[in-house]
Amino acid sequence: MTCINLPARTGQQFSISHGDYEAVITELGATMRKLTYKGEDLTVALGPDDLVTCCHGQILIPFPNRIEGGEYTFEGKTYSLPIDEHDRNTAIHGYGYRSFWKLISLAEDAVTLAWRSPNMVGYPFDLYVTATYSLADDGMHLTVSAYNNGDTNAPWALAIHPWLANSLNGYGDEIDEHNAKCSLTLPARTHVTVDENLIPTGTEPVDGTKYDLREDTLLTEQPFDDAWTDLEHAEDGSVTAVFTRADGKKVRVGGDETITSFQVCTGTKFPAFQHPA
């Protein structure tokens, strides 16, 4: 058998660095495969040939979350998407993470990748999306831009999906115990309610509930796989959630005025091979 020098299963690997920060972004899904500070993982690291479980580190476009039965209506027309979460009968997290993105530019501290939506059943719209990862003194910055190349309006939404490292590197049943040593501050007034298939059903105020994380809160009342909205933005439009790891180090996740919600998943009951903590 002839040996072939194959690329990694996640495609080309784009390494960037700035000061004490280093990251690896992959061609597959524009995935942030690894992010470290002074050599220590800030996100759960993946190998270049590993199975990317739970959309770890990926960009969720043209829609995040779940669409019940794979059907949605946009401007009076109903579209049917392929079902890819069969136990809940939903379409989940879009298609950008399944594709190899095109490299646009690469510098020592930044990389830009691009993706064009294929003409597919259930989403015939023509989007061109760019994602720029850049490292600076204060960490990782991600800028995503979307362009509609079609002659009609296009439905579009975006989320990012990093799994933050809690510093204890636990698996399976260890995750809840380890997360209980961590805390979270999340500036949101409203919690999103869901049905048994995690389809949103409405909203409720967080006041007086375990979902009020506006003050630093230990993650002992688990599990969470929940969304929050009605965010408390600062005067400059920014909003930031703060995750304090078991070792006391703080990881800040935030954005500008375009950020409308946060999702928190604690990885409870995830099988060990998925390792999201």
Give names to the regions the model predicted.
Residues C3-I4, A8, S17, I83-D137:
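Extended, loop-rich substrate-binding clefts of extracytoplasmic carbohydrate-active enzymes
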Residues A165, N169-T258:
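Active-site/ligand-binding surface loops and adjacent short beta/alpha elements
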Residues L6-R9, T26-L28, F63-N65, G94-R98, ...:
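Short solvent-exposed loop/turn micro-motifs enriched in small/polar/acidic residues
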Residues I16, A23, S117-L164, L168-Y171:
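Acidic, contiguous internal or C-terminal segments within carbohydrate-active enzymes
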Residues M1-L81, V239-I259:
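Beta-strand-rich N-terminal accessory domains
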Residues K249-A277:
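Active-site pocket scaffolds in enzymes
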Residues T73-K77, I104-V111, S134-G139, D176, ...:
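A short, structured loop/turn motif at beta-sheet edges
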Residues D50-Q58, I83-D87, T112-P118, Q222-D225:
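Short Pro/Gly-enriched beta-strand edge/turn motifs at strand-loop
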